[in-house]
């Protein structure tokens, strides 16, 4: 996954999953179970994979069919609206539908390995949280506490931390979404 470039995964009833990704991600993706990987040179602002994605979809579905996208609430296309419009224009014989519900249902299915990874990170986070009070000192800021917490997660086996809010205050906290402050 890239924070700036789209990555596409095509899931078909009749084919193994196919990844359509920027070429910079190919080496990493080859280490996974995905066997079919199509790439484009990126960055390429005039075509961030839409032509490769279009051709791949046409090869899978031929000239008609439904294309499900995660376009429901709490979802992201991970491509510009202009690129989405271009894709729909390129594939005008196809019907684009909201597949959010089925994608969420698929995400609920976990392998034994995924379950073990989830248990591991829950254990790591719980242990760090349970011991946090031993390391907090008077006059530490939320930023310092949050940074300590992140370091402890990493040093105890977490792969990375994407986002962490932090809040404090007399009698509790009044929000759970903001970044830590100098408070």
Name each region found by the language model.
Residues 1-124:
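A composition/biophysics-driven feature that prefers long, compositionally simple stretches
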Residues 1-3, 100-102, 109, 140-183:
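Short catalytic-site patches enriched in acidic/histidine residues
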Residues 19, 103, 115-120, 133, ...:
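Functionally constrained cores in energy, signaling, and assembly domains
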Residues 122-132, 142-144, 150:
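Active-site pocket-lining segments that scaffold enzyme catalytic pockets across diverse folds
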Residues 137:
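Contiguous, non-catalytic segments that form substrate-binding/exosite surfaces or channel walls
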């Amino acid at each position: 996954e890239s924070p700036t470039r789209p990555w596409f995964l095509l899931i078909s009833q009749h084919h193994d999953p196919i990844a359509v990704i920027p070429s910079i991600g190919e080496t990493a993706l080859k280490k996974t179970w995905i066997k079919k990987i199509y790439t484009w040179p990126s960055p390429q602002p005039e075509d961030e994979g839409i032509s490769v994605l279009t051709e791949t979809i046409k090869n899978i579905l031929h000239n008609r069919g439904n294309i499900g996208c995660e376009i429901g609430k709490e979802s992201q296309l991970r491509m510009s609206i202009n690129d989405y419009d271009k894709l729909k224009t390129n594939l005008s014989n196809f019907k684009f539908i909201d597949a959010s519900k089925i994608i969420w249902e698929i995400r609920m299915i976990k392998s034994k390995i995924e379950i073990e990874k989830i248990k591991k990170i829950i254990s790591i986070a719980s242990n760090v949280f349970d011991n946090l009070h031993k390391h907090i000192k008077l006059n530490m800021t939320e930023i310092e506490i949050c940074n300590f917490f992140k370091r402890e997660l990493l040093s105890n086996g977490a792969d990375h931390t994407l986002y962490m809010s932090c809040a404090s205050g007399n009698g509790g906290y009044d929000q759970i979404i903001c970044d830590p402050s100098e408070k």
